[in-house]
Amino acid sequence: MSAFTPASEVLLRHSDDFEQSRILFAGDLQDDLPARLDTAASRAHTQQFHHWQVLSRQMGDNARFSLVATADDVADCNTLIYYWPKNKPEAQFQLMNLLSLLPVGTDIFVVGENRSGVRSAEQMLADYAPLNKVDSARRCGLYFGRLEKQPEFDADKFWGEYSVDGLTVKTLPGVFSRDGLDVGSQLLLSTLTPHTKGKVLDVGCGAGVLSVAFARHSPKIRLTLCDVSAPAVEASRATLAANGVEGEVFASNVFSEVKGRFDMIISNPPFHDGMQTSLDAAQTLIRGAVRHLNSGGELRIVANAFLPYPDVLDETFGFHEVIAQTGRFKVYRAIMTRQAKKG
């Protein structure tokens, strides 16, 4: 994480303005500018574990990862630089949380790509920190205002839920498929065999729907779920609890915090990181799976049909199968055999 995003490049045009500021960086922190910008003091808060990993190496305890920021996370800051995400409800959750903690008079900067909908920050913050556009470059907008009134923030009001075949799915802003089960996950679920046993790892678990649906017809599986997203981790825990399913859920950058081996790894891996297309997570998932599968264990993933995963599967496992497909999606299966590279 060394090259700066367009949003950070816009901020750097104003770097002189930040030298005396005590800044809290938050939102979609796609690079390490928070650790490198010359300021009086810098903190960062993120809901993304992989962003925290990068920033904490340089910022130590001044980089925080959690679903909800606390007063300690914003202590002594007089400026907020918020990177607008692609998901408006996610921005609403984060900004209301942060502005409820920061003191009146705090300088508020919001920056983001135009295609992300950053313009809607003006309306969102109109009652609390009226914004004006102060720069436009690199297809991004930079907005500035001053906090005039702290909003009230109640994280519980942001929870949502929906039902899938009698299962209750709990969701939060920023969680994949927040409003219903996506088509890719439906296809993957259709391939899971009832009465399966053994240890199952759900990587990129989102709201936990794959795991609870699997556990309903295979109650003897032992579930472990992980995701980079703090909202996803909390949503999965809530989904498991709502359906009486046991499982361990934790934050992890693909396999970074995963220990041990499993009989099956399932995933609907992301191919976007913020506004950017990225195949890194899925390729890391495929290549790293061999270090976390028992002999005879399998990796089963669903992906958009156009994504170039077959080559990586063959390179890693020696072969793969397509066990279900539609015009848009394919479910891939690869077995841990002696042919597989041991990582």
Swiss-Prot record:
The keyword Oxidoreductase does not apply. Its EC number is 2.1.1.172. InterPro entries: DNA_methylase_N6_adenine_CS, Mtase_sm_N, rRNA_ssu_MeTfrase_C, RsmC/RlmG, SAM-dependent_MTases_sf, Small_mtfrase_dom. It is found in: Cytoplasm. Transmembrane segments: none annotated. Its main location: cytoplasm. It catalyses: guanosine(1207) in 16S rRNA + S-adenosyl-L-methionine = N(2)-methylguanosine(1207) in 16S rRNA + S-adenosyl-L-homocysteine + H(+). Keywords: Cytoplasm, Methyltransferase, rRNA processing, S-adenosyl-L-methionine, Transferase. The keyword Transport does not apply. GO terms for cellular component: cytoplasm. GO terms for molecular function: 16S rRNA (guanine(1207)-N(2))-methyltransferase activity; nucleic acid binding. It is an enzyme of class 2 (transferase). Monomer. NCBIfam families: PRK09489.1. Belongs to the methyltransferase superfamily. RsmC family. Specifically methylates the guanine in position 1207 of 16S rRNA in the 30S particle. This is Ribosomal RNA small subunit methyltransferase C. The gene is rsmC.
